Swiss-Prot record:
Signal peptide: none
InterPro entries: UPF0756_TM (IPR007382)
Species of the source: Acinetobacter baumannii (strain AB0057)
UniProt GO cellular component terms: plasma membrane
Protein name per the record: UPF0756 membrane protein AB57_2455
Top-rank lineage group of the source organism: Bacteria
UniProt keyword Signal present: no
Presence of the UniProt keyword Transferase in the record: no
Subcellular location: Cell membrane
TM regions (residue ranges): 1-21, 51-71, 83-103, 115-135
Protein family membership: Belongs to the UPF0756 family.
Keywords, sorted A to Z: Cell membrane, Membrane, Transmembrane, Transmembrane helix
């Protein structure tokens, strides 16, 4: 009986419940979709999701971030002013730092998969309990890489 116990499915169910209790749609939908994929023949797409999911997620996030520029909601004048405002210059510097940390995070997660579980648990807890957004694993891994020197 214990051989049939799927710890990964239980973890997904716990995440689904956490998402529901915290009213976090992102965690709820992600866990629900993954549960459906896991318990159906769709589980054959897991290698594809694992290979391309992160890049697809980053692409969708980038499209979302750039949409105000494309739609004109953020005017060209506002964009140009961002290069003369102190607050905007600090924002640009922080954006550069975060992008660099994210790059380090991707490398660390690829080279040291043993840290991925901890990063994911921390990120999901932050999303579910602190109403954060699930961009944390890359930045968290980037920060971790600074601490462990990788």
């Amino acid at each position: 009986m214990l051989a049939q116990f799927d710890v990964n499915l239980v973890v997904l169910l716990v995440l689904l419940i956490c998402g529901l209790l915290s009213q976090n749609a992102a965690v709820t939908i992600a866990a629900g979709v993954l549960i459906v994929i896991k318990i159906t023949p769709l589980n054959l797409i897991f290698p594809y999701i694992q290979a391309h999911g992160l890049n697809l997620g980053i692409l969708i996030l980038t499209i979302g971030v750039l949409t105000p520029i494309a739609s004109g909601k953020l005017s060209g004048e506002s964009i140009l002013k961002s290069f003369i405002s102190f607050k905007s210059l600090v924002a640009i510097a922080i954006g550069l730092l975060v992008a660099w940390l994210g790059g380090r995070g991707v490398k660390l997660m690829s080279s040291q998969p043993d840290v991925v579980a901890g990063l994911l648990i921390g990120t999901v807890a932050g999303v579910a309990l602190l109403r954060g957004v699930p961009v944390g694993p890359l930045i968290a891994a980037g920060l971790l890489s600074l601490f462990i020197g990788k």
